Amino acid sequence: LRFSYPDGREALRGVTFAIAAGETVALVGPNGAGKSTLLWHLNGLLPGKAAAPLTAQGHSHGISLRPSRRLEPAVWVDGLAVDDRNGPEVRRRVGLLFQDPDDQLFSTTVLDDVAFGPLNLGHSKAEARRIALECLTRVDLADAAGRVPHHLSFGERKRVCLAGVLACEPSVLVLDEPTANMDPRGRRRFLDLIRGLECTKLIATHDLEMVLDLCGRALVLDAGRIVAEGAVADVLGDEAVMDAHGLEVPLSLKLGRTLS
């Protein structure tokens, strides 16, 4: 996958990877590496082009950006090509959670915000409200249904956004810095919610302790390229890789080595 912004800056330079259904994978890297840009391609917010022919073979229910001899769309998610033909269905299947909840919230009440997705999927107003209340209950915010979203705390707004994504019943969840700017209590609560979701998850983050806690595999993105991937402990514990790409080995891994 390749992508350049209108000013000519090449943000993605031949990114290739695959995530199997049900995996929880971390995307880590320094600021400006292209992490958010990559995430925005997974539900069609940004159009990309293939760096080489690609296929979805063998990854019909996950995320696939893999070389092939046949020319295919650059990104496949949950068995669908991410292109103009499949845009609405891709956006239903792929839930994208932005880093800043204020980029995602726009309605006058929490309930209306969470119900927006189901309404646009064709549900009746009554059914959309039922789904919204159910999802607000899942994130422990049912009592905030009638409140103005922007009057809530940062962590609460983040949970409203998660409820709005879950209301569309995605099979793939893409999260951009889900714990950024959260206090410890809000972070723990949000991580518990993410941990309990049974779907494919790709998490872009600088919170490497969270990666150790939640993820089975890690991808390192730097300067628009995947420069390392593998089991979380192997990747995050590789001092040479981490240092070369502006990252630090998590403290818990360092302490574990010292104690052993």
Question: Which residues does each PLM region occupy?
Answer:
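The feature captures the beta-strand-to-loop junction immediately N-terminal to the Walker
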Residues: 28-30
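Catalytic Walker B motif of ABC-type/P-loop ATPase nucleotide-binding domains
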Residues: 173-176
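Helix-to-loop junction immediately C-terminal to a conserved catalytic motif
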Residues: 43
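Conserved ABC ATPase "signature" region
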Residues: 126-144
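Conserved ABC ATPase signature
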Residues: 148-152, 156
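A short, surface-exposed alpha-helical micro-motif characterized by mixed small hydrophobic
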Residues: 211-213
